[in-house]
Every structure is written in structure tokens, then in C-alpha cells.
Amino acid sequence: MTPPGAPKYVIGVDFGTLSGRALVVRVADGAEMGSAEHTYRHGVVTEALPGHPEVRLPADYALQVPADYIDVLRFAIPEAVANAGIDPADVVGLGTDFTACTMVAATSDGTPLCQLDEFADRPHAYAKLWRHHAAQPQADRINALAAARGETWLPRYGGLISSEWEFAKGLQILEEDPEIYAAIDRWVEGADWIVWQLTGRYVRNISTAGYKAIRQDGKYPSRAFLAELNPGFASFVEDKIEQPIGRLGEAAGTLTAQAAAWTGLPEGIVVAVGNIDAHVTAAAADAADPGRLIAIMGTSTCHVMNGRFLREVPGMCGVVDGGITDGLWGYEAGQSGVGDIFAWFTKNCVPKEIAIEASRRGLTLHEHLSELAAEQEVGEHGLVALDWHSGNRSVLVDHHLSGIMVGQTLDTTCVDQYRALLEATAFGTRMIVETFQRSGVPVEELVVAGGLIKNPLLMQIYADVTGLPLSCVTSTQAPALGAAIHAAAAAGEYRDVPTASARMGGRTKNAFTPIPENVTRYNALYAAYVELHDWFGRNNPLMRRLRVMRSNAERRETVGSAQ
């Protein structure tokens, strides 16, 4: 127990795509005292199951091993506390955030099915990472049926349900491995599963229930709708996902003895209701007011913002009452690939001599390419790209789309291509901004968080392309800070999350502002982007046909290697 007068601390743990990060934060002012990161031992499983190299995975699979999440608690939290130099007894609360929609197939006590010997060689027993896109056929059927039936919840998701979400992934398991589906007692969001492990209580957070499980106005899709999709899916809600709902900033429970042993924290401290990594960042930015579009830029980008009123926005990921901040409508959009695209390019498309020069200068490839690209005038490279290398989340909601670059000649360089890809992701964000604005949801400020904030060229491009002032979240670990702020509210240290955020969060306002001549030039490039966007994304099935060809070829290769 914290002695009277001693400083109080909370810990936020951010479970990302490749690693988990723990951050120790002082309750009084949000000072970040110490942190630590633990990389998932198994990373993202995309080719073969761990320990079962003979089990090859089809295209678009992205799985994880839930035991890796527990290792974050065991290693990152004690290390962060040690780095902070504080007494663990002074920690009063713990908050977490998670990628979403990342799903764990579990038994009734929370044990992941992949940890059971009889299911260790079954892909559908493993956690499905947010970027598992192999359920697109199921998502297509959900969308078609919902539209045909006039389901009232569909417009709140922009008219389309994503293959990344709970129902599409669950239906895929039913149809591809019915035995695993039958063995699933709880189909659990990673955000809730980790809180379950910490507290011994399974509480569904209102955010993922709304954004990823189609819960609107207190209800999930009807039994009749699910039965029409597949008779075996009729009881999916009551059998697999229905659970008491916890609001953001509330306590989900307290730390169990086992979790205290893992973390080195006091047994009985408050654990906040789980949250989504993007949405929790609003608290870290102190940007919960309507009109602030927060872009959390990493491997992908998630865009979140609050509004005072309910609006139905085409192609958005959803709108949920209290989904970001209690008492406001929380809107979500996103881009499936951003940092992933830049990483792919530097890994596969940069000549050796460029890499050698970057190394000689003591720069990363990204830094070197960005410096060279910054020397160009807007439009100098003559290129326009589509940022769909991981599909399109908003506004087309189609993960069978793919990337493209138009305008290449024999004079085109890798620097030209790199800048075009940076710009393509900014154009994707502008498409989202304009869709919000046309739907009656005003956007007045772009607030950026995440690792890509360190690239000044990219930030200026985003300001110029969108025409918006761009603010930068002060913390370099914004999701973890946001989780810690929610922990402070859950522990009763502040009246609510906005009050805690005002004391503990913050952003550098107007860090980048639009350059008028660049805005004008980018308007012309953006018009070309919109042409490509609509032709390839709305009016032509070419990209889908190419995906089918690829899948068929991989299927033949898998069959051939098995014979």
C-alpha cells in the first residue's frame, strides 16, 4: 500500500503487433518514469505453425501465440518498474491496450486452444491477429446478407463489415474447422483476454464489442441473421461472445495473486477495463474533444475521433456510443498498411549502393531515403501510388485490393518511388478526412501519434495533403500512456478519463502547418489518386482476379508439396 504523501504511479501496457511495452507513469502529472519492451517470441505466424513446420498456412493468414502476451507481463512490467526506480508498492493501477481485432479461441477458463496438445497443429486454434485477412469470403457474405435484409446496424459501419472482425473470423472457423469451432467456449478479444488473465474476470470492453463485434444499441446481430448465414452459426452470440460489458475508464477487477507473481506488482491493485491501442491514444493526446482526428501511425494507421452526434459515414470502421470517451460518439477509420508498406519497400526495392551510402552516413534507410526525397518538388517524380499493399480498410473495406504505382519510366528511381508511397498513405488519410466531412462530422485538426511521427518529411506531407494543421502527441509511447491514464481513472485518482487526460496527457499543437503552394500542387496529385482509387477500388475487379490467381497457384504448390 502506498504510504501517505508518497507519489503514486500507474502502469500502462501496450500490446502491439510484434511486441508489448510497459510504461510507468506518475499519477500527479503524467511524467513517464521508465519503460521496457518485450518482443513476442513467435512474432506473427504467417507461413507455418510453431513446432509444426509441416502445417503450412494459406495466403492472408496472420496468427499469434497467446503465451507471448503473458511473457510481456512477466518481463516488460518488472523491467519497466526497475528502470523507473520506483517501489512497486506505490503502483495503484494497471491499464492495458491491444491490437484489434485480435481474437483468442479459448476454453471456459480462458485457456487458448492452441495450448492444448490435441489442437497444437490446427491453425484455427491460434490467436487471429488483426491483420488476418483470410476471412474475406465470409465478410463478403455477411455484407451481402446484411444489405439484402436491411440490417439497421450496417450503416453504422460504413455499409461494410471487415474481414478483420469477430464475426467473419468466427464464421471462417466454423466453416473450415468445425471441431475447433465446437471446442471454443469463449471467442475473446485480445484486449479482454489479457485483462481476464490479470484479474480472473472476463469483462467485455464496450469499445471492441461495438467496433469489432457489431454491438449497437445494446444488441448484437440477431439469431435469425446468423442462422441465414450458416445454420451452425445461429447461436454464435450466446455461445461464444456474449459477456457483461465494461465501460472505458472503469475497473474490470483487481490483480490476482498469480498475476502479481508474474508482474511483481501488489496483489489487489485495480486493473482497468481493456481498450484498443488506437482509441486509448485519445487520452494520451488530451484530444477527446470533437473535431480532433487522431491518426496512430505504425505498421498500419487507425484514425479515431469523437463527435457529439451520431452520423453514418460510408466506409468507416464504425461509430460506437462511448467507444473512445464515455458520453461521446466515437468514430473509427483506418488504413491497413502504412509503416508496413515503407518497410516492405526498403527490404525489397532499394539498390545495394543506396543501402551502403545510408550505412556510411550512419542513417537508417528510411532516414536516408526521406532526406533525398525531401529535395524534390511536389509532383517532380511524376508518380501516383495506391496504398493498398495490405488491402483497403477505409473507405472501401476490401482486403482483396492491392498496391499499384502509376507513372514509372526508365528514369524513375527508388527515391521517387519511396516519396510516392509516403504521399499515397497521406492521400488515403485525406480520403478518410473528406468522407467524414461530407457526412457531417467536422475535422479541424490532425493529431498524430506513433513511430512514424519521427519522420518530418512524412508529417509535412500529411499537413500539405490534408490541408489541416498537424499536432504531434508528446509521448513517444502514446498507447501505453493512454492505458495508464485509464488506469488512473479506474483507480479513482481522477473523476474520469478526460480529467485524468488533461493532467497526464498532451500534444504539441500545430507542429506542422500546410504550406500553401504545396497544398495547391497536392490537390492535382490527389485528383489523380482519386481517379485510380475509384477505378481500381470501385469499378474494376482486376485486383480481385489477381488475388484469386495467386491463391490458386499457392494452393497447387501446397498440394504438390504434400504429395
UniProtKB/Swiss-Prot annotation:
Reaction(s) the record says it catalyses: D-ribulose + ATP = D-ribulose 5-phosphate + ADP + H(+); L-ribulose + ATP = L-ribulose 5-phosphate + ADP + H(+)
Keywords, ordered alphabetically: Arabinose catabolism, ATP-binding, Carbohydrate metabolism, Kinase, Nucleotide-binding, Transferase
The protein's annotated pathway: Carbohydrate degradation; L-arabinose degradation via L-ribulose; D-xylulose 5-phosphate from L-arabinose (bacterial route): step 2/3
Name of the top EC class for this enzyme: transferase
Keyword Kinase attached: yes
GO cellular component, one term: cytoplasm
Example GO molecular function: ATP binding
Protein origin, superkingdom: Bacteria
InterPro entries for the chain: ATPase_NBD, Carb_kinase_FGGY, FGGY_C, FGGY_N, Ribulokinase
Matches recorded under HAMAP family: Ribulokinase (MF_00520)
Entry similarity comment: Belongs to the ribulokinase family.
Protein name: Ribulokinase
Organism whose genome encodes this protein: Mycolicibacterium smegmatis
